[in-house]
């Protein structure tokens, strides 16, 4: 848990640490955030980030093997989320679990 109450579940943490071991850079940087789109208005995104693209306005959370980066506008929507990971063949991958979302679409990738 960190100042902005973003929780990373053990399965997500384990998977991010395993990705980090495959990374050729010194440290793995992962950017999370929200963008306009999806059937409920906003959708989550998660992508690799270069250290040189991190600005002074970004929020940075250091873990042992990786760094999580979030812009200061997205954090308003991501406060209190849990980042989870499932290796399931159907609907597997990273999931954003947002207790503050008023509405989510059927696939869970979009919210309002």
UniProtKB/Swiss-Prot annotation:
**MF terms per GO, please?**
iron-sulfur cluster binding; metal ion binding; protein-macromolecule adaptor activity
Protein's GO biological process? iron-sulfur cluster assembly
The intrachain disulfides are none
This protein's UniProt keywords: Chloroplast, Iron, Metal-binding, Plastid
User: Which cellular components does GO assign to this protein?
Assistant: chloroplast stroma
Query: Which positions in this protein are listed as binding Fe cation?
Result: 39, 105, 107
Pfam families found in the cross-reference section: Fe-S_biosyn
Its localization reads: Plastid, Chloroplast
Q: Which domain of life is it from?
A: Eukaryota
Q: Which residues cross the membrane?
A: none
Query: What protein family does this chain belong to?
Result: Belongs to the HesB/IscA family. Ycf83 subfamily.
Name used for this protein in its record:
Uncharacterized protein ycf83
Q: Which organism is it from?
A: Galdieria sulphuraria (Red alga)
């Amino acid at each position: 848990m960190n100042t902005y109450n973003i929780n990373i579940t053990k399965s997500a943490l384990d998977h991010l640490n395993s990705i980090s071991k495959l990374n050729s850079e010194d440290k793995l940087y992962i950017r999370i955030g929200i963008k306009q789109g999806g059937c409920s208005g906003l959708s989550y995104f998660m992508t690799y980030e270069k250290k040189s693209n991190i600005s002074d306005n970004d929020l940075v959370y250091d873990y042992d093997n990786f760094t999580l980066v979030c812009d200061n506008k997205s954090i308003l929507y991501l406060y209190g989320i849990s980042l989870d990971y499932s290796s399931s063949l159907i609907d597997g991958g990273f999931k954003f679990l947002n207790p503050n979302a008023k509405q989510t679409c059927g696939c869970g990738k979009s919210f309002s």
